[in-house]
Amino acid sequence: MSHLQSLLLDTLLGTKHVDSAALIKIQERSLCVASPGFNVTPSDVRTLVNGFAKNPLQARREGLYFKGKDYRCVRADEYSLYAKNENTGVVVVKTHLYLLVATYTEGMYPSICVEATESLGDYLRKKGS
């Protein structure tokens, strides 16, 4: 297991309020690491990278299509994108090199998912990643 994968598992999935997580390399538009069982397709990667490449207001208006579901965007700015679909959601945080992706499902607290993902994003930005 790579250092980055164990970081995802320990800091995000370890909260019990993140269902799955992944790191996407922004420049290469490719998946770097993901939690076991989290299959992020090239189409999903493009969707997330484009969500930040476009004007954040556009992502907010149009929402996000991720992993076969339409999500309503509840926050979109330079560094963060939060979207939800009923009782599930996706949190995406941008660092210098990566998009950090975390999902939550019914019964999990979105606020804990957001806090853990944003904290890991801050850590990676401070490390220059």
Curated annotation (Swiss-Prot):
Any one Gene Ontology molecular-function term assigned to this protein's record: lipid binding
Tissue specificity field: Expressed in testis, in germ cells in seminiferous tubules (at protein level). Prominently expressed in pachytene/diplotene stage spematocytes.
Biological process terms in GO annotation: acrosome assembly; flagellated sperm motility; manchette assembly; sperm flagellum assembly; spermatogenesis
Pfam families named in the record: Profilin
Compartments in which it is found: Cytoplasm
Alphabetized UniProt keyword annotations: Cytoplasm, Developmental protein, Differentiation, Lipid-binding, Spermatogenesis
GO-annotated cellular components: cell cortex
Xref: InterPro entries: PFN, PFN_euk, PFN_sf
Family as reported in the entry's similarity comment: Belongs to the profilin family.
Role this protein plays: Involved in male fertility. Required for manchette development and acrosome biogenesis during spermiogenesis. Binds in vitro to phospholipids, including phosphatidylinositol 3-phosphate (PtdIns(3)P), phosphatidylinositol 4,5-bisphosphate (PtdIns(4,5)P2), phosphatidylinositol 4-phosphate (PtdIns(4)P) and phosphatidic acid (PA). Contrary to other profilin family members, does not bind to actin in vitro.
Protein name per the record: Profilin-4
